[in-house]
Amino acid sequence: TKACGPGEWVSYFRGGPRHTKAHLDEAIDASLARLQTDYVDLYQLHWPDRRTNFFGQLGYTHDQDAEETPIDDILTALESLVVSGKVRAIGLSNETPWGVMTFLEIARREGLPVVASIQNPYSLLNRTFEIGLAEIAHRESVGLLAYSPLAFGVLSGKYLEGARPAGARLTLFDRFSRYSNPEATRATEAYAQLAKAHGLTLTEMALAFVTSRPFLTSNIIGATSLEQLKENID
């Protein structure tokens, strides 16, 4: 499970969620109660508690006045959850190369829990992970839990030729336009032709690409029907 970071869109969580000890303690206790369990194997920070760019945002803007929780304080808070037995391992999500390396450096220097994984987007349409994070994941043993391997379903091919299937994500939510720009559409069309030439569905090829990466630990598939689930697993 995860603890979300700060953001106006989640201000109703805990009066404005942060990664302070008080917030993380409250968040894990609530998660354990909902899950009806005494512990979780992996506890992730959903996005950073500092001003940086994530969720597909390009460009970093520094704001020296922005509030943020120091990473050593975050790790100390997470250590208490590990010691208490509520959490077995910790992970990051939607993190940057600087963030991952800083978490690792402080943890090793101070004897605090070392990050085990990072859950970031990765697909044939989003390979930004390869720029600075792939080598870190591989050499530092911080396994990638790749989310959105089908790029919001675009790499299933269901949106080709302008189609908008009823109930599909991009049909319901126009704001998810990250993978529906002209460049992504042209790339998807080319990938579909390549998959067909090799006797594969676009979904099969897209998922196989992600799964074959040496820095991958888990490919997080998503399905809304048994048919989709079968194709994802096959």
Give the location of each predicted region.
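A short, structured active-site edge motif that brings together acidic residues
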Residues: 1-8, 118-122
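Non-cysteine beta-strand/loop elements that form the S-adenosyl-L-methionine
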Residues: 1-2, 41-45, 145-149
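Surface-exposed, active-site-proximal loop segments in enzymatic domains
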Residues: 5-20, 51-60
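Intrinsic disorder/low-complexity segments
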Residues: 10, 26-28, 174-177
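Short, acidic/polar
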Residues: 17-35, 71-76, 100-105
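Short amphipathic alpha-helices and their capping/turn segments at secondary-structure boundaries
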Residues: 24-39, 132-141
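Active-site groove signature of glycoside hydrolases
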Residues: 33-56
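Beta/alpha (TIM)-barrel catalytic core signal, keyed to glycine-rich beta->alpha loops juxtaposed to Asp/Glu
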Residues: 48-234
